[in-house]
Design a protein with these regions (language model features):
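Periplasmic-binding protein-like
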Residues: 165-174, 282-303
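Ligand-binding "clamshell"
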Residues: 118-130, 144-145, 223, 228, ...
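A conserved helix-loop-strand patch within extracytoplasmic ligand-binding domains
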Residues: 130-179, 288
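Short, low-complexity disordered leader/linker segments with a strong preference
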Residues: 1-56, 304-307
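Short helices/loops that flank or line small-molecule/ion binding pockets
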Residues: 76, 94-106, 121, 171-172, ...
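Short beta-strand-to-loop elements that line the ligand-binding cleft
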Residues: 84-91, 183, 188-189, 206-212
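A bilobed periplasmic-binding-protein/Venus flytrap-type ligand-binding module shared by bacterial periplasmic
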Residues: 137-149, 258-273, 277
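Short, polar/charged alpha-helical segment
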Residues: 56, 63-86
Length: 307
């Protein structure tokens, strides 16, 4: 929409070139009307050049629950204040950040602070958390058993295979009494899931710990006795409706912050008009009620304001 308006603006300038003054013509071609809509900071970060007349907010998201929350609630809340919301859905975790960095998005909404900080460091991005919205608790799911007490010694339990979520899944198993500890998992590269499976001190019930791609855990659930599954993948597979979690994560103040999904913007734009309008909408009573009514504990509101 912005590009279309800028093209029309330039055409308008060309048509009137013969009658307008040189100064007015130069004004039509000023940087503020550039099709890119952004200029580069000296430190390499992108800075959106949009003015107060731009009432459109473009946000990159993952499908569930992020897109649902924005499309079903936030869009209407923003409209009441005169804002238009465009939701751009991504299937991965990389493009929402690079698209935000390049100025194609005004914000994104899919990630935790830890992931954002890692991407800033590893990929040289310049992103900042603006406000927390929700937590997707990891849960212990099973198609074979209806309570954790039914799960027998030696059962096979799946966990995600990426480092952060693998440790998160194991800590959930500790929290719910399956394991005494995670042993040296994550601290000693020679200590594997097999090591933990055979560690009688950490794993007195002899559970077989099986790391799998996080997105594949719901598909693998029929072949496992149980699995620790991330909330977004559980929702995507409709597990909470068909096979409700036997247990879900509990959070103290520190872990709640670490597990919260944040609205993220480019550094320096945390206080912009667009960012503040978006924060107001995503942290509204309407969003909180929608989360409670729709997800019934598989998503939890976590309205954190970044300082």
């Amino acid at each position: 929409m912005k590009k279309k308006k800028n093209i029309l603006k330039k055409l308008f300038c060309l048509v009137l070139a013969g009658v307008l003054t040189a100064a007015l013509f130069t004004g039509c071609g000023s940087p503020a009307g550039d099709d890119s809509g952004d200029t580069k900071k000296e430190d390499g970060a992108d800075k959106t050049a949009g003015s107060g007349d731009d009432k459109k907010i473009t946000v990159g998201v993952n499908p569930v629950p992020h897109a649902d929350i924005l499309e079903n609630v936030v869009k209407d809340v923003l409209a009441k204040d005169g804002w238009e919301l465009e939701v751009v859905v991504f299937q991965d975790y990389v493009l929402p950040n690079t698209s935000l960095e390049s100025g194609e998005l005004d914000a994104n909404y899919f990630q935790t602070l830890g992931y954002m900080n890692q991407q800033n460091e590893d990929a040289g991005l310049h992103l900042a958390a603006a406000a927390g919205v929700h937590i997707e608790p990891m849960g212990i799911y099973s198609q074979k058993y209806s309570s954790i007490e039914e799960i027998p010694d030696g059962a096979e339990i799946g966990i995600p295979n990426d480092p952060d979520n693998a440790e998160r899944g194991l800590q959930l198993l500790v929290q719910k009494g399956f394991l005494n500890s995670i042993g040296d998992y994550g601290r000693d590269e020679n200590y594997t899931a097999d090591s933990l499976s055979n560690d009688k001190e950490a794993n007195p019930h002899g559970y077989k710990i099986t790391p799998l791609e996080a997105a594949n855990l719901p598909l693998s659930l029929p072949d496992l006795d149980a699995a620790a599954i991330n909330g977004n993948y559980a929702l995507g597979a409709d597990l909470p409706s068909n096979y409700p979690a036997l247990e879900i994560e509990e959070f103290d103040d520190e872990t709640a912050v670490r597990r919260t999904n944040f609205i993220v913007v480019r550094q320096g734009e945390e206080e912009s008009e667009k960012t503040q309008a978006l924060i107001k909408a995503v942290q509204s009573d309407e969003v909180k009620q929608y989360i409670e009514d729709t997800y019934k504990g598989s998503v939890i509101a976590s309205f954190i304001e970044e300082e």
